[in-house]
Amino acid sequence: MAMTAEVKDELSRLVVNSVSARRAEVASLLRFAGGLHIVSGRVVVEAEVDLGIIARRLRKDIYDLYGYSAVVHVLSASGIRKSTRYVVRVAKDGEALARQTGLLDLRGRPVRGLPAQVVGGSVADAEAAWRGAFLAHGSLTEPGRSSALEVSCPGPEAALALVGAARRLGVSAKAREVRGSDRVVVRDGEAIGALLTRMGAQDTRLTWEERRMRREVRATANRLANFDDANLRRSARAAVAAAARVERALEILGDTVPDHLAAAGTLRVAHRQASLEELGRLADPPMTKDAVAGRIRRLLSMADRKAKQDGIPDTESAVTPDLLEDA
């Protein structure tokens, strides 16, 4: 089951005892998933959701809290509708329900944001408002670089009201318009986890956090592997460059090179990929890596001085781009 469906399934099964919170959830769900329609001169309240369990929860809450009967219509997937949708409709008592849930104000005008009683309600009401909004039009992506908890909103006023509700819960959410659609987005991983718990999806939060941690561990392992690979490549290039310079140094100095420096240089050329420590062990008698490095350094310095005096290419001339590219 996708993360969004997991959250919605868990929220739909959540038992809420507070009447105020249940009313806030219904009001928010109707606001974000529904609309008011005039049919034969009467106000009809409709809410379209993507899971049958959400539709049944809404129908039950409307009856338990307000005493009005709602009908659930199933819209099967066909044509441009990719999945089955469920429409909860209250026709007979639509206007009364709209007024009581705050979809209409006292003058009978549609409310653009969230109802005042929800905006000014308790923290539990703010949690319920988010729960209703997510059940209506929420989505949660898999943990990763672009992970997000997002709610599509019916307008900018509703989006700002939802941002305010998140702020009351200690969560930073942002309202933005994407391709003409108003959305509220939470991107921070810790904030997403906190909001899931606040809404009542603790089990899904644990699953999401586990996947998030696994992904972070994999990403860290990949970074370390890449880091090790890069270090190996740098070391290989440095060894090849050093061997090429030493080879050129031996050419420049010819028979004038001191025996102990020639021995160190010959080892470097013969074992191009070996570390200084390994070269020291191969020497006869064995030397420390510092002793090997010192002798090679003196060999290069002596060769570069002679090259300058003779006006010929120095040891650096042996290190060509093609040489490093092949390393």
From Swiss-Prot:
InterPro entries cross-referenced by the UniProt entry: Homing_endonucl, Sporu_reg_WhiA_N_dom, Sporulation_regulator_WhiA, Sporulation_regulator_WhiA_C, WhiA_LAGLIDADG_dom
GO MF: DNA binding
PANTHER family the UniProt entry points to: CELL DIVISION PROTEIN WHIA-RELATED
Family: Belongs to the WhiA family.
Keyword Cell cycle: yes
DNA-binding region per Swiss-Prot/TrEMBL record: 275-308
Task performed by this protein: Involved in cell division and chromosome segregation.
Protein name: Probable cell division protein WhiA
GO biological process, one term: cell division
Keywords for the protein's UniProt record, in alphabetical order: Cell cycle, Cell division, DNA-binding
HAMAP family: HTH_type_WhiA
Superkingdom: Bacteria
Region (Disordered): 304-327
Keyword Ribosomal protein listed: no
